[in-house]
């Protein structure tokens, strides 16, 4: 356990705390670290026919570009923090994918044995509640999950 850590971050305060927790685990166990962020799917049903419909493709393409640029910033900051701690890490942005799905799928594909993530993301409604994505990862993961508060 703790040999291959996937740390999920959305750039929020808890996302940054999750990266810090992954740093401590990696230091203690000599772990490999993969930093992941995902972008939610973009709704594509806008103007799907009938009177008044329009071509949403340019808007969706722009949203995808904006999400990718934001993900790049999030991952660069996490990588900088890991590097400053003497830990090399890989980074990955998974576009158009719900966070829980991205976390579970990538952890399996990469053979990770531990997931580190915040108790809730930017959409979280309170520090005492477990966010829906964290709850889903906990229920679906077959590896260790560290929830950071």
Describe every region a protein language model picked out.
Residues 55-73:
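A short acidic, glycine-rich active-site loop
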Residues 76-115:
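Structural beta-alpha unit
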Residues 24, 105-149:
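Gly/Ser-rich helix-loop-strand patches that form or flank binding pockets
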Residues 18, 45-48, 101-104, 127-129:
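Short, well-ordered secondary-structure micro-motifs
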Residues 8, 95, 118:
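Conserved residues at the C-terminal ends of beta-strands
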Residues 3-58, 81-90:
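Small/aliphatic-rich secondary-structure junction motif
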């Amino acid at each position: 356990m703790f040999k291959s850590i996937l740390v999920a971050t959305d750039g929020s305060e808890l996302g940054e705390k999750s990266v810090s927790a992954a740093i401590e685990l990696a230091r203690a166990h000599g772990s490999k670290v993969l930093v992941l962020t995902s972008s939610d799917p973009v709704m594509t049903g806008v103007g799907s026919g009938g009177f008044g419909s329009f071509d949403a493709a340019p808007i969706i393409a722009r949203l995808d570009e904006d999400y990718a640029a934001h993900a790049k910033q999030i991952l660069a900051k996490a990588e900088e923090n890991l590097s400053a701690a003497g830990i090399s890490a890989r980074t990955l942005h998974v576009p158009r994918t719900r966070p829980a799905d991205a976390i579970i799928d990538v952890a399996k594909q990469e053979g990770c044995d531990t997931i580190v993530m915040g108790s809730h993301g930017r959409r979280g409604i309170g520090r005492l509640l477990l966010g829906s994505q964290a709850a889903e990862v906990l229920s679906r993961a077959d590896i260790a999950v560290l929830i950071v508060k």
